Amino acid sequence: MIAKHGNNSSTSLSGSADLLQHAQPKAPVISATTNKTLPHIYDKSNYALLYARDWHPGMKHAAPIRKEVPVRTIFNLLGPLANPLQDTGMVECCVLGVARKDIGENFAEALRLGNARKALVVCGDENLDEVSCAGPTHCWYIREEGTSVDITKLIVAPEDFGLPRHPLSEVHGGKGPAENAKILMQILRGELPDDHPVLHFVLINVAALLVVSGICEADTSSMGAGDDGNVDKERGPGGLRWKEGLRRARWCISSGEALRQWEGFVEATNEHAQ
Protein backbone atom coordinates (compact mmCIF):
# COMPACT_ATOMS: atom_id res chain seq x y z
CA MET A 1 0.00 0.00 0.00
CA ILE A 2 1.23 3.49 -0.88
CA ALA A 3 0.28 6.54 1.21
CA LYS A 4 1.54 9.62 -0.62
CA HIS A 5 1.31 12.77 1.49
CA GLY A 6 0.89 15.60 -1.00
CA ASN A 7 -0.35 19.12 -1.51
CA ASN A 8 -0.88 21.85 -4.09
CA SER A 9 2.16 23.72 -5.27
CA SER A 10 3.50 26.66 -3.30
CA THR A 11 6.98 27.13 -4.74
CA SER A 12 6.91 25.04 -7.95
CA LEU A 13 4.79 24.85 -11.09
CA SER A 14 2.92 21.74 -10.03
CA GLY A 15 2.46 19.89 -6.76
CA SER A 16 1.38 16.26 -6.56
CA ALA A 17 -2.20 17.30 -5.73
CA ASP A 18 -2.33 19.68 -8.70
CA LEU A 19 -1.19 16.91 -11.01
CA LEU A 20 -3.78 14.39 -9.82
CA GLN A 21 -6.59 16.94 -10.01
CA HIS A 22 -5.85 17.44 -13.73
CA ALA A 23 -5.70 13.76 -14.70
CA GLN A 24 -7.80 12.70 -17.68
CA PRO A 25 -10.21 11.25 -18.67
CA LYS A 26 -11.34 11.20 -15.03
CA ALA A 27 -9.52 12.63 -12.05
CA PRO A 28 -9.57 11.25 -8.51
CA VAL A 29 -11.35 13.32 -5.88
CA ILE A 30 -8.41 13.69 -3.53
CA SER A 31 -10.45 15.41 -0.83
CA ALA A 32 -12.47 12.18 -0.52
CA THR A 33 -9.52 10.40 1.10
CA THR A 34 -10.15 10.68 4.84
CA ASN A 35 -9.40 8.56 7.88
CA LYS A 36 -12.91 7.10 7.52
CA THR A 37 -12.76 6.35 3.79
CA LEU A 38 -9.15 5.16 3.65
CA PRO A 39 -9.92 1.48 4.43
CA HIS A 40 -12.43 1.33 1.56
CA ILE A 41 -10.04 3.07 -0.82
CA TYR A 42 -7.38 0.50 0.03
CA ASP A 43 -9.92 -2.22 -0.73
CA LYS A 44 -10.07 -0.87 -4.29
CA SER A 45 -6.46 0.21 -4.78
CA ASN A 46 -3.03 0.00 -3.21
CA TYR A 47 -2.58 3.76 -3.67
CA ALA A 48 -3.91 6.79 -1.81
CA LEU A 49 -2.99 10.45 -1.76
CA LEU A 50 -3.36 12.06 1.66
CA TYR A 51 -4.23 15.65 0.79
CA ALA A 52 -2.28 17.79 3.24
CA ARG A 53 -4.88 20.56 3.36
CA ASP A 54 -7.53 18.10 4.54
CA TRP A 55 -5.38 16.06 6.91
CA HIS A 56 -3.75 19.18 8.41
CA PRO A 57 -6.56 21.77 8.10
CA GLY A 58 -4.72 24.38 10.13
CA MET A 59 -2.09 24.62 7.40
CA LYS A 60 -4.57 26.17 4.96
CA HIS A 61 -4.10 29.50 6.72
CA ALA A 62 -0.45 29.53 5.69
CA ALA A 63 -1.10 28.62 2.05
CA PRO A 64 -1.78 32.16 0.70
CA ILE A 65 1.31 33.52 2.40
CA ARG A 66 3.48 30.68 1.11
CA LYS A 67 2.43 31.45 -2.46
CA GLU A 68 3.51 35.07 -2.01
CA VAL A 69 6.97 34.11 -0.75
CA PRO A 70 9.16 33.19 -3.76
CA VAL A 71 11.57 31.02 -1.75
CA ARG A 72 11.41 27.83 0.27
CA THR A 73 10.34 28.23 3.89
CA ILE A 74 10.17 26.10 7.03
CA PHE A 75 6.98 24.56 5.63
CA ASN A 76 9.01 22.92 2.87
CA LEU A 77 10.94 21.13 5.61
CA LEU A 78 7.94 20.22 7.75
CA GLY A 79 5.76 18.84 4.95
CA PRO A 80 7.79 15.69 4.17
CA LEU A 81 7.86 14.76 7.88
CA ALA A 82 4.13 15.30 8.42
CA ASN A 83 2.66 12.19 6.78
CA PRO A 84 -0.44 11.66 8.95
CA LEU A 85 0.02 7.89 8.96
CA GLN A 86 3.63 8.04 10.15
CA ASP A 87 2.73 7.83 13.85
CA THR A 88 0.01 5.20 13.46
CA GLY A 89 2.33 2.24 12.98
CA MET A 90 0.83 1.68 9.53
CA VAL A 91 3.88 2.94 7.61
CA GLU A 92 6.26 0.04 7.06
CA CYS A 93 8.82 1.97 5.02
CA CYS A 94 9.26 5.33 3.33
CA VAL A 95 11.41 7.28 0.92
CA LEU A 96 11.75 10.97 1.69
CA GLY A 97 13.39 13.54 -0.57
CA VAL A 98 15.17 16.66 0.64
CA ALA A 99 16.43 19.53 -1.50
CA ARG A 100 19.65 20.15 0.43
CA LYS A 101 22.38 17.64 1.14
CA ASP A 102 23.34 19.33 4.40
CA ILE A 103 19.99 18.47 6.03
CA GLY A 104 19.74 14.87 4.86
CA GLU A 105 21.21 13.39 8.01
CA ASN A 106 18.93 15.55 10.18
CA PHE A 107 15.86 14.24 8.37
CA ALA A 108 17.08 10.68 8.73
CA GLU A 109 17.56 11.20 12.45
CA ALA A 110 14.07 12.72 12.72
CA LEU A 111 12.61 9.63 11.03
CA ARG A 112 14.60 7.35 13.32
CA LEU A 113 13.37 9.19 16.40
CA GLY A 114 9.86 8.91 14.98
CA ASN A 115 10.20 5.10 15.09
CA ALA A 116 10.95 4.59 11.38
CA ARG A 117 12.52 1.17 10.90
CA LYS A 118 12.94 1.07 7.12
CA ALA A 119 13.45 4.40 5.36
CA LEU A 120 15.62 6.20 2.86
CA VAL A 121 16.29 9.94 2.76
CA VAL A 122 17.52 11.02 -0.67
CA CYS A 123 19.06 14.14 -2.18
CA GLY A 124 20.38 14.29 -5.72
CA ASP A 125 23.83 15.78 -6.13
CA GLU A 126 22.16 18.80 -7.75
CA ASN A 127 20.23 19.37 -4.49
CA LEU A 128 17.27 17.56 -6.01
CA ASP A 129 14.65 16.08 -3.68
CA GLU A 130 14.47 12.86 -5.71
CA VAL A 131 16.74 10.01 -6.72
CA SER A 132 18.60 11.75 -9.54
CA CYS A 133 18.70 10.42 -13.10
CA ALA A 134 21.60 12.77 -13.88
CA GLY A 135 24.25 11.54 -11.47
CA PRO A 136 24.92 10.56 -7.85
CA THR A 137 22.24 10.66 -5.18
CA HIS A 138 23.19 11.02 -1.53
CA CYS A 139 21.22 8.60 0.64
CA TRP A 140 20.75 8.07 4.34
CA TYR A 141 19.49 4.53 4.86
CA ILE A 142 17.60 3.78 8.08
CA ARG A 143 17.21 0.12 8.99
CA GLU A 144 16.70 -2.00 12.04
CA GLU A 145 19.68 -4.15 12.99
CA GLY A 146 18.86 -6.40 15.92
CA THR A 147 17.84 -4.16 18.79
CA SER A 148 19.17 -0.93 17.25
CA VAL A 149 18.12 1.28 14.35
CA ASP A 150 21.12 2.48 12.35
CA ILE A 151 21.61 5.21 9.75
CA THR A 152 24.04 4.41 6.93
CA LYS A 153 25.25 7.01 4.43
CA LEU A 154 25.61 5.75 0.86
CA ILE A 155 25.58 7.05 -2.71
CA VAL A 156 23.67 5.56 -5.62
CA ALA A 157 23.70 6.47 -9.30
CA PRO A 158 21.55 5.47 -12.31
CA GLU A 159 24.05 2.79 -13.32
CA ASP A 160 23.46 1.02 -9.99
CA PHE A 161 19.92 0.45 -11.29
CA GLY A 162 21.28 -0.65 -14.67
CA LEU A 163 20.26 2.56 -16.44
CA PRO A 164 22.16 5.36 -18.23
CA ARG A 165 22.34 8.89 -16.93
CA HIS A 166 20.10 11.64 -18.33
CA PRO A 167 20.53 15.40 -17.91
CA LEU A 168 17.82 16.97 -15.78
CA SER A 169 16.92 19.12 -18.79
CA GLU A 170 15.57 15.94 -20.43
CA VAL A 171 13.18 15.17 -17.57
CA HIS A 172 11.92 18.63 -16.77
CA GLY A 173 8.22 18.56 -16.00
CA GLY A 174 5.54 20.13 -18.16
CA LYS A 175 4.56 23.77 -18.12
CA GLY A 176 1.77 23.08 -15.66
CA PRO A 177 -0.23 20.38 -13.89
CA ALA A 178 -2.33 19.49 -16.95
CA GLU A 179 0.76 18.69 -19.01
CA ASN A 180 2.31 16.76 -16.12
CA ALA A 181 -0.90 14.78 -15.68
CA LYS A 182 -0.77 13.86 -19.36
CA ILE A 183 2.78 12.55 -18.91
CA LEU A 184 1.68 10.55 -15.87
CA MET A 185 -1.05 8.83 -17.85
CA GLN A 186 1.38 8.07 -20.69
CA ILE A 187 3.65 6.36 -18.15
CA LEU A 188 0.83 4.35 -16.57
CA ARG A 189 -0.47 3.25 -19.98
CA GLY A 190 3.00 2.15 -21.08
CA GLU A 191 3.02 4.66 -23.93
CA LEU A 192 6.56 5.95 -23.39
CA PRO A 193 9.49 4.13 -25.05
CA ASP A 194 11.47 1.84 -22.74
CA ASP A 195 14.48 4.17 -22.98
CA HIS A 196 12.58 7.42 -22.38
CA PRO A 197 14.43 9.64 -19.85
CA VAL A 198 11.24 10.49 -17.92
CA LEU A 199 10.34 6.81 -17.62
CA HIS A 200 13.84 6.06 -16.34
CA PHE A 201 13.51 8.88 -13.81
CA VAL A 202 10.25 7.46 -12.50
CA LEU A 203 11.53 3.89 -12.46
CA ILE A 204 14.60 4.56 -10.32
CA ASN A 205 12.49 6.38 -7.73
CA VAL A 206 9.94 3.57 -7.60
CA ALA A 207 12.78 1.06 -7.44
CA ALA A 208 14.29 2.85 -4.43
CA LEU A 209 11.06 2.39 -2.48
CA LEU A 210 10.87 -1.28 -3.42
CA VAL A 211 14.47 -1.80 -2.33
CA VAL A 212 13.91 -0.14 1.05
CA SER A 213 10.73 -2.17 1.61
CA GLY A 214 12.83 -5.34 1.65
CA ILE A 215 10.87 -7.13 -1.07
CA CYS A 216 13.93 -7.18 -3.33
CA GLU A 217 15.70 -9.45 -0.85
CA ALA A 218 13.42 -12.33 -1.85
CA ASP A 219 15.18 -14.97 -3.94
CA THR A 220 11.97 -15.88 -5.76
CA SER A 221 9.50 -13.75 -7.67
CA SER A 222 5.91 -14.40 -8.72
CA MET A 223 4.39 -10.96 -9.21
CA GLY A 224 1.99 -12.16 -11.89
CA ALA A 225 1.66 -12.42 -15.65
CA GLY A 226 4.79 -11.22 -17.41
CA ASP A 227 7.11 -11.90 -14.47
CA ASP A 228 9.66 -14.48 -15.60
CA GLY A 229 10.76 -15.02 -12.00
CA ASN A 230 14.39 -14.23 -12.76
CA VAL A 231 15.42 -12.30 -9.66
CA ASP A 232 18.41 -9.99 -10.19
CA LYS A 233 20.58 -10.83 -7.20
CA GLU A 234 23.38 -8.38 -7.97
CA ARG A 235 24.12 -6.10 -5.04
CA GLY A 236 25.19 -2.48 -5.21
CA PRO A 237 25.73 0.35 -2.72
CA GLY A 238 24.75 -0.59 0.82
CA GLY A 239 24.69 -4.25 -0.20
CA LEU A 240 21.23 -3.73 -1.68
CA ARG A 241 19.61 -5.08 -4.87
CA TRP A 242 18.96 -1.88 -6.80
CA LYS A 243 18.66 -3.65 -10.17
CA GLU A 244 16.05 -6.01 -8.76
CA GLY A 245 14.10 -2.96 -7.62
CA LEU A 246 14.25 -1.66 -11.18
CA ARG A 247 13.08 -5.00 -12.58
CA ARG A 248 10.07 -4.99 -10.28
CA ALA A 249 9.29 -1.33 -11.02
CA ARG A 250 9.28 -2.05 -14.76
CA TRP A 251 6.90 -4.96 -14.24
CA CYS A 252 4.43 -2.70 -12.42
CA ILE A 253 4.02 -0.67 -15.60
CA SER A 254 4.47 -3.33 -18.30
CA SER A 255 1.94 -5.63 -16.64
CA GLY A 256 -0.67 -2.88 -16.46
CA GLU A 257 -0.85 -3.30 -12.68
CA ALA A 258 0.10 0.32 -11.96
CA LEU A 259 -2.68 1.51 -14.27
CA ARG A 260 -5.21 -0.82 -12.64
CA GLN A 261 -4.34 0.48 -9.19
CA TRP A 262 -4.66 4.06 -10.42
CA GLU A 263 -8.09 3.32 -11.88
CA GLY A 264 -9.14 1.74 -8.58
CA PHE A 265 -8.08 4.89 -6.72
CA VAL A 266 -10.02 7.11 -9.13
CA GLU A 267 -13.12 4.92 -8.82
CA ALA A 268 -13.03 4.71 -5.02
CA THR A 269 -12.54 8.43 -4.42
CA ASN A 270 -15.29 9.35 -6.86
CA GLU A 271 -17.65 6.95 -5.09
CA HIS A 272 -17.05 8.70 -1.77
CA ALA A 273 -17.44 12.14 -3.32
CA GLN A 274 -21.04 11.42 -4.36
Region spans (language model):
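Active-site cofactor/substrate anionic-group-binding motifs, chiefly glycine-
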Residues: 1-10
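Active-site-proximal loop->helix
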Residues: 9-26
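Glycine-rich anion-binding loops and their surrounding alpha/beta cores
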Residues: 21-274
